[in-house]
Amino acid sequence: MWNGIIPGLVLVAMITAVAFSAHNVSGFALFSPMILAVVAGMVYSNVLGTPAHAKAGIAFSQKRLLRFAIVLLGFQLTLGQVVSIGAGGVGIVAATLGATFVFTITLGRLIGVDRKLAQLIAAGTSICGASAIVATNIVTDARDEDVTYAVASITLFGTVAMLGFPLLAPALGLDQHAFGLWAGASIHEVAQVIGAGFQNGTQSGEIATVAKLTRVTMLAPMVIALGLMARRKTSGGQQAARPPMPWFVAAFVAVVALNSLVTVPAEVKSAMALATTIMLTMGLAAMGLQADISQLRSRGLRPLALAFCAFLFIGCFSLVLVKFV
């Protein structure tokens, strides 16, 4: 088995190394290594072609490594973090997440966006960007091109939010607490939330980070819900063999609980965070290696329009809640 996957793992690791190196270059620091890995993988695949002998290792990275990375993500979360923003903050985050997800799925159906792609865009917008798209795709089983399209669109509008929202704070009359809650409840990627939050002050950055991590804790119930939806959508009315709660979701919940009950040394948490980022980056590099640009073009602009509308909705909906609730 290992001999068969080594060539693909080496290729994925090389692209991952390029992504991390590029992330440290001025001008690219705005983008996470995960996003850069998708782009690098696509460029490699569509310019040079993906070798046949690397397919097994690429598939291993895309499936098993990604699942394990989602589990390790639990070491970055505790229930205490959720409690720290208060019941009102948790309510705003939960309401924004649920409303955005339903809005995006509904609008996607109305404008003719493929159901699976709409679900990926909905998850990426409402929860935590690329990580949510990856986790969601394990139960939706969309095409690699759909995953790449969703990641690209979420990255685009998340970057717009990261750069633009801090500039709007004074005009909207938001203090540091309110802005942090708004940024954490609405901006797509964790790194983008941190970037936007700390532009407005330390308190704002800390609240934004906690609010965002609260959204991440809702990844597990969202994946379970999508798993149940996928079972109902199977042909002939028969249930799919895939369980409604994948093993990695149960493991993710268990790790969050463990991290909440047991004091994990800071050095261990730091190592786990790095390992999580590396494995997520490898998984997205693998997806980029299997993405066909011609297939992306065939999707047209409707999914991009859907992502834009979802971006506007989550920003406006959460702002109203922060200002008036």
From Swiss-Prot:
Subcellular location as annotated: Cell membrane
Mode of membrane association: Multi-pass membrane protein
Alphabetical keyword list: Cell membrane, Membrane, Transmembrane, Transmembrane helix
Pfam families xref list: Cons_hypoth698 (PF03601)
GO cellular component: plasma membrane
Keyword Transmembrane among record annotations: yes
InterPro entries linked to this entry: UPF0324_pro (IPR018383)
Family statement: Belongs to the UPF0324 family.
Protein name: UPF0324 membrane protein mlr2225
Source organism of the structure: Mesorhizobium japonicum (strain LMG 29417 / CECT 9101 / MAFF 303099) (Mesorhizobium loti (strain MAFF 303099))
